Design a protein with these regions (language model features):
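Beta-propeller-forming repeat regions
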Residues: 1-191
Length: 191
């Protein structure tokens, strides 16, 4: 994927490129074009990424998700400083007991006006089920924290689903991410 981003103050625009290497690993490269010179400002392995103003600072931020060696998920929030270098603002891990990887990530605004991330993670014994986590950036602690509208446990249970294509997304374009749920008997035929 290729996209343009406004990751730092001013008129400079960055080029964000996600690509797959020959061995199947995913990499993200961010380039800056200044005074006729294209330069790499970040190159990093990832599983999912998102460019969004999650900190509420007015510029877009870079959110990278990767799978840890123990199977958990790491969420990394990066911002660009005035010199054009990436700063790691926050890192958060999701337990391998719950998640085996990241299936998708979406960002939206809640009814309270805050910016939120919805992460859909692979879970279950087979690793083929999905469940969701709702996170927000806490300005006081400068960390990604679970949202307080619903407990992490309740959201995990309510969003547990066995249809891999049912990912969280803004379905109606209102800026709010819808999180799919699956009723207990969904997809079962009782005779």
């Amino acid at each position: 994927s290729v996209g343009l981003a406004q990751l730092q103050p001013g008129d400079a625009t960055q080029l964000v490129v996600g690509y797959t290497a020959a061995q199947g690993d995913h990499y993200l490269a961010v380039y800056s074009y200044t005074d006729g010179v294209l330069s790499t400002i970040l190159e990093q392995q990832y599983q999912q990424y998102l460019v969004e103003d999650i900190t509420g600072g007015g510029n877009q931020d870079l959110i990278l998700m990767s799978t840890l060696e123990d199977g958990g998920v790491q969420i990394e929030l990066l911002t660009v400083d005035k010199e054009g270098s990436f700063q790691q603002v926050a890192v958060m891990g999701l337990s391998a007991n719950r998640f085996a990887g990241c299936a998708s990530v979406a960002a939206g605004v809640g009814a309270d006006g805050r910016h939120y991330l919805v992460l859909d993670g692979w879970t279950g014994i087979s690793g083929n089920n999905l469940a969701s986590v709702l996170l927000r950036f806490d300005e006081d602690t400068q960390q990604m924290v679970p949202a307080d509208q619903i407990s992490t446990e309740k959201l995990y249970t309510a969003s547990l689903r066995n249809v891999p294509s049912l990912v969280s997304q803004d379905l109606d374009g209102d800026g709010i991410v819808e999180i799919p749920t699956q009723p207990d008997e969904a997809g079962l035929l009782n005779m």
